């Protein structure tokens, strides 16, 4: 039984689209082959930034011959009914069979469909899949009609069996399938032929391409952690970033760098978020927990072992962190002045056109937190103060740049303003839990503010008839309801 190897080679595929594209390619091709009458033993799918690859083992050489029967009208039925049956089947009357039935003789149409060779079926299925591939975003280029996520440059499609390989005659616009591909864009750009999946993967590795994304992830993580350990440091785990970076490189080369002394005083969340979002760097911390370095992943091998790449990355990182330091210092100055400017600024920020501004909402939450405080063992005055402070960081420069830091920065700013640890922690913890695995706040002040925040949101949206429906919940009210239930259950012991 032959094995199928399909490679769709293009310009860089966005990392965020690769996992879905792998699954779509596998499902669409295998479903199409099975629907056409072929069977297979197994299928694997792979991706790099420049290629989607499908390998199918044990594909049947041809589809089975099929005999189909279709029951028609009785022999004494009106002529119009018989003519309609003939038109629908495309047969003439003398091609129909008469068979005895309980109600008399009935016409039957019999179709004999011979088996088809696998190459012809594969060519049809692959062409259809390429033309109708469900990319979230796609583009056209040149004068052709084909749409792809980035310009599709070549198609490799072969059926191999016992050492021989046959090129499948796939043609899409001006692209015709071949048995050749190429390696790394810079390290091995020349094209070369392949005869099987094993031959393909071996030659790609010699051409500086690591085909399996899981292997690239493991290589990046192992090399990064080993380099950090050798320097008495550790890499901050980040599974999402690891997957993304593995989708940006074909031949990962891990480089360990240092953060400039001028930026080591920034909060670790700021350093980590800035490096992750802007540079796709992993954060590296000392045993004390302070972030002191970073890991970047290059896509090439250099004669100076990455020194030039690392120097360039450190220069860009310094510029990014200079911005973050500027935001931090300005925000700290506002915090030490009492954060009144931020509170006034929230008066012009609409929470919902039927529920007022963020300032109005904060006042409601503060009043409610003061009512809840005695029930959870918190001081009412402190709970109200925490509620009025918790969302002020929404007007800060840092949260404006990195919205995901809301609450976390609020804790730092409350501390800089000289407020109590309970008030500062409430700024960070009142958003929790954000998911089923998140911890529920335990400090009484944080619990009072967290419950008040969620209750105000839920009752407010119910009051204006913005309830979640079966398929829509734009304000995440279900999640908020579950979170408030978890908080109440915790309080009940």
Where are these regions (language model features)?
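Hydrophobic alpha-helical segments, chiefly the membrane-spanning helices
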Residues: 489-493
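Amphipathic alpha-helical "coupling" segments that flank catalytic cores
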Residues: 1-488
């Amino acid at each position: 039984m032959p094995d199928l190897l399909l490679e769709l080679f293009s310009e860089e595929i966005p990392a965020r689209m690769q996992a879905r594209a792998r699954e779509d390619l596998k499902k669409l091709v295998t479903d199409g082959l099975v629907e056409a009458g072929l069977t297979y033993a197994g299928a694997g799918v792979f991706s790099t930034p420049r290629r989607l690859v499908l390998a199918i083992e044990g594909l049947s050489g041809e589809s089975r011959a099929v005999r189909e029967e279709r029951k028609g009208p009785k022999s004494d039925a009106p002529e119009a009914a018989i003519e309609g049956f003939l038109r629908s089947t495309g047969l003439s009357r003398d091609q129909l069979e008469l068979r005895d039935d309980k109600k008399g003789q009935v016409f039957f149409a019999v179709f004999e469909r011979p088996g088809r060779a696998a190459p012809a079926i594969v060519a049809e299925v692959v062409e259809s899949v390429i033309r109708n591939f469900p990319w979230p975003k796609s583009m056209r280029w040149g004068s052709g009609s084909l749409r792809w996520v980035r310009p599709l440059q070549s198609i490799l499609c072969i059926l191999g069996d016992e050492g021989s390989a046959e090129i499948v005659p796939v043609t899409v616009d001006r692209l015709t399938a071949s048995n050749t591909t190429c390696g790394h864009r810079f390290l091995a750009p020349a094209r070369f032929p392949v005869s099987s999946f094993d031959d393909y993967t071996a030659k790609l590795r010699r051409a500086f391409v690591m085909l399996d994304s899981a292997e690239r992830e493991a290589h990046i993580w192992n090399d990064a952690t080993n380099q950090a350990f050798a320097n008495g440091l550790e890499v901050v785990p980040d599974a999402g970033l690891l997957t993304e970076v593995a989708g940006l490189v074909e031949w990962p080369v891990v480089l360990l760098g240092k953060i400039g002394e001028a930026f080591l005083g920034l909060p670790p969340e700021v350093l980590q978020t800035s490096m992750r979002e802007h540079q796709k760097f992993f954060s590296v911390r000392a045993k004390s927990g302070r972030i002191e370095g970073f890991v970047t992943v290059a896509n090439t091998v250099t004669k100076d072992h990455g020194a030039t790449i690392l120097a360039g990355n450190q220069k860009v990182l310094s510029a990014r962190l200079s911005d973050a330091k500027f935001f931090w210092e300005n925000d700290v100055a506002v915090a030490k002045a009492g954060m009144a400017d931020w509170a006034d600024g929230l008066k012009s920020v609409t929470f919902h056109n039927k529920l007022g501004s963020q300032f109005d909402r904060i006042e409601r939450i503060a009043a409610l937190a003061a009512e809840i405080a005695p029930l959870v063992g918190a001081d009412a005055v402190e709970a109200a103060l925490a509620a009025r402070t918790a969302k002020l960081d929404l007007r800060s420069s840092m949260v404006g740049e990195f919205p995901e830091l809301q609450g976390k920065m609020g804790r730092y700013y409350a501390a800089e303003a000289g407020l109590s640890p309970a008030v500062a922690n409430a700024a960070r913890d009142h958003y929790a839990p954000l998911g089923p695995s998140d911890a529920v706040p335990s400090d009484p002040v944080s619990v009072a503010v967290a419950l008040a925040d969620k209750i105000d949101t839920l009752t407010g949206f119910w009051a204006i008839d913005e309830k979640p429906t079966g398929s829509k919940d734009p304000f995440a009210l279900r999640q908020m309801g579950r979170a408030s239930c978890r908080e109440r259950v915790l309080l009940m012991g």
